[in-house]
């Protein structure tokens, strides 16, 4: 188990809270884009604006749940505590943004768009399967984005494009990001087992999708070792 001092745990939690704040700000910009532009162009611009959050998280090495799940294959059982702690802190950061927005001039506009977005998903007849599968697709794209910061430079590719493009795609497609969803649910104002179930399924979906690429990379490394 990786030993962490009390100070390191506090820093970990603070960086996770700031990651939630970054996602909340990016999500807010995305909602405003959808509200004022609508259609495909609004979604594309919204995805680009949402990518600000992920780009900031990678640049400042913040702790985001959907980014940390990629480390699950090598994390070890005794370090798994970081995942729920990270998610809770991410959710606190997103909630802080939502509270601040309540006192801003764009509150009504953001709330209407957030309720429209998450309300439609929540009340679908296939909401459970949608949350799981949509969350998995989002998890795949988030891992691609975060890993691009490590792999792209080695291949002579643009790190910025590699980080931003998967985020634009997932936001454009409307895939479920469990942390961003927490802000949308805050504005929805509904507390029920239905909501809890949706949140949990999107978390599981993000985790499943997030570990797929790392597992394939590990398998590729194993196969390379066998061929030596």
Feature map (PLM): residue ranges:
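Alpha-helical transmembrane segments and their helix-helix packing motifs
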Residues: 1-228
């Amino acid at each position: 188990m990786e030993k962490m001092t009390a100070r390191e745990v506090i820093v970990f939690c603070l960086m996770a809270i700031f990651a939630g704040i970054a996602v909340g700000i990016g999500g807010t910009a995305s909602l405003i884009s959808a509200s004022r532009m609508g259609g495909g162009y609004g979604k594309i611009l919204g995805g680009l604006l949402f990518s600000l959050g992920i780009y900031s998280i990678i640049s400042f090495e913040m702790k985001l749940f959907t980014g940390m799940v990629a480390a699950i294959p090598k994390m070890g059982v005794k370090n798994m505590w970081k995942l729920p702690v990270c998610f809770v802190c991410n959710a606190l950061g997103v909630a802080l943004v939502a509270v601040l927005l309540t006192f801003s001039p764009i509150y009504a506009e953001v709330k209407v768009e957030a309720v429209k977005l998450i309300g439609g998903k929540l009340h679908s007849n296939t909401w459970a399967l949608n949350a799981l599968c949509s969350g998995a697709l989002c998890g795949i794209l988030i891992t691609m984005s975060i890993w691009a910061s490590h792999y792209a430079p080695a291949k002579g590719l643009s790190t910025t494009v590699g980080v931003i493009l998967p985020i634009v795609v997932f936001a454009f497609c409307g895939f479920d990001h469990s942390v961003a969803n927490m802000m949308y649910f805050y504005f929805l104002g509904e507390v029920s087992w239905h909501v809890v179930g949706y949140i949990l399924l999107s978390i599981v979906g993000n985790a499943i999708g997030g570990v797929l690429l790392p597992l394939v990379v590990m398998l590729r490394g194993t196969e390379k070792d066998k061929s030596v």
